Amino acid sequence: MAPSRGLQPLHFSEGFSRCRSTLQHQSRNARPLQWSLHARRTYWSFTENLSNPSNKLQSYVSRSSDPYLNLSIEDHILRKSPPDSTILFLYVNRPCVVIGRNQNPWSEVNLSILNAATGTTDLKDTEPPGIGAVELVRRRSGGGAVFHDEGNLNWSITCPRTEFTRDKHAEMVVRALRKQGIERARVNERHDIVLDQGHERRPSDPNDMHRTPYTVDDGVPKPLKVSGSAYKLTRQRALHHATTLLESPNLHIISQYLRSPAKHSIEAKGVESVSSPVSNIGLDLKAYQKRLQDVFATMYANVGKISVTATVDDEYLNIPDIRKGYDELRVRLFNLSVSVHL
């Protein structure tokens, strides 16, 4: 696809007008609440299992590709699960740009491309990549801006706050990758998962999740990032979630969405993203998803067996608490220019 042409720095008055237009477009397309007997049964089954103190280990996979819904289910898990439980949640979103709670979308995202692709503005000087509408979503955790699509598996762990470290579950993911034959995978000093690009194979400890036979200490060639994470802490709980670039068909255009033409003309507070070269891992998503579930079960085998293994889907939007979070994400996204309190 051709890159954007002739983009001008965004002015806030113009930008807010576009945001209102985008918000109206999103509101018109929001799905209605359908509170049926089946939905009530779904609610009680899911929430009862989730909040049951005897269910120390749980594993869920989403069949929905709605980023607002998946993030709202994730938040529901964080707030409703028992304080001493550990829960794995896996999901894949349709194409979207997800920014952190404390980020300024004007300096992190090419809003002109997003608005042109959704048809909310008529920008004749902007040519979006030809993959259709790409939504902008603000998550409740911190961290930087990322691109999601059908080739990216998102993993989420909710656990007791006292057991949380930024490396613990990143190392779990690396173990799963290595079991799939990806021996270059490791956790770096920023707690991201990267693929080492060294040419010479050296001896290394296979149990060390922070070095590989191809780790280069002088940083050349640079490793390629395949997973970036963020987290949210509450009084008793911790949520740690991340992307995993497995087989994204849009790797070549991600930078067009995550590079704002207004970045250098805006002076505002907010967390800036750290740009890194990225790569696909080259694994089948379904096969790796199963492997990750198995590694999670092995990692927590001392706690017991996973007592709940289930799928969630679009009907979970009918759960009032999830619907409330869903509506909050859609409405608040364009409400502030820098960051929000969620």
Where are these regions (language model features)?
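Structural beta-strand/beta-sheet cores of well-ordered domains, especially the beta-sheet scaffolds
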Residues: 86, 95-97, 153, 191, ...
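Intrinsically disordered, low-complexity domain-flanking/linker segments in eukaryotic proteins
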Residues: 112-129, 197-222
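Short beta-strand-to-turn element immediately C-terminal to the catalytic PLP-Schiff-base lysine
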Residues: 99-100, 196, 246-247
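Long, positively charged amphipathic alpha-helical accessory segments at protein N-termini or as interdomain linkers
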Residues: 3-4, 76, 171-185, 202-342
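FAD-binding core of FAD-dependent oxidoreductases
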Residues: 139-154, 190-198, 225, 231-239, ...
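Contiguous, small/hydrophobic- and glycine-enriched helical/loop subdomains that border
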Residues: 150-198
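N-terminal lobe of the biotin/lipoate ligase/transferase fold
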Residues: 2-167
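A short, structural micro-pattern
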Residues: 91-93, 130, 147-149, 187, ...
